[in-house]
Amino acid sequence: MKVIFTEDVKGKGKKGELKDVSEGYARNYLIPKNLAVAATSGNIKDLEAQEKSKQKKAEAELQKAKAMKEELEALKIEIPAKAGEGGRLFGAVSTKQIAEALGKQGKKVDKRKIQLDEPIRSLGYTKVPIKIHPEVVATATVHVVEA
């Protein structure tokens, strides 16, 4: 019997997957526990419509991320910090400070999306990658100035 899984079932199938399982397993376990529905033509059309809307939503997110990338790369992020001789900072500039500086400029970015290998410890310009979307990474320019 063909069924469409409505939830992940370990070892059998993932949510939204169309699969052939034994009649008894489907009627006595999967369908009563709402883990799957019978694969009728109506249910298959619903599944296809859901997948289409998911694709459209993912495409819209990707476009939004690309637009955000353009905006972030155009911004100049300036962070004041106390520095000693030779441009070495007292302390360091972390992802949290970069996220706050972006927030002040109207761009809300989660600090976990800022991919800084190690905190910035010197004055000057630094290129910082920001992962906006799994497929889109913006490279922002952070300028650390002496306070």
From Swiss-Prot:
Q: Which InterPro entries does this UniProt record tie to the protein?
A: Ribosomal_bL9, Ribosomal_bL9/RNase_H1_N, Ribosomal_bL9_bac/chp, Ribosomal_bL9_C, Ribosomal_bL9_C_sf, Ribosomal_bL9_N, Ribosomal_bL9_N_sf
Q: Spell out the Gene3D superfamilies in the cross-references.
A: Ribosomal protein L9, C-terminal domain (3.10.430.100), Ribosomal protein L9, N-terminal domain (3.40.5.10)
Domain of life, per the record?
Bacteria
GO cellular component assignments: ribonucleoprotein complex; ribosome
Q: Tell me which Pfam families the record gives.
A: Ribosomal_L9_C, Ribosomal_L9_N
Asked if the record carries the keyword Chloroplast, the reply is: no
**Molecular function via GO:** rRNA binding; structural constituent of ribosome
GO BP terms: namely: translation
- Keyword set for this entry? Ribonucleoprotein, Ribosomal protein, RNA-binding, rRNA-binding
Provide the function of this protein: Binds to the 23S rRNA.
Question: Which NCBIfam families does the entry mention?
Answer: L9
Spell out the family assignment given in the record's similarity comment: Belongs to the bacterial ribosomal protein bL9 family.
Q: Which PANTHER family match?
A: 50S RIBOSOMAL PROTEIN L9 (PTHR21368)
What is this protein identified as? Large ribosomal subunit protein bL9
Which gene carries the instructions for this protein? rplI
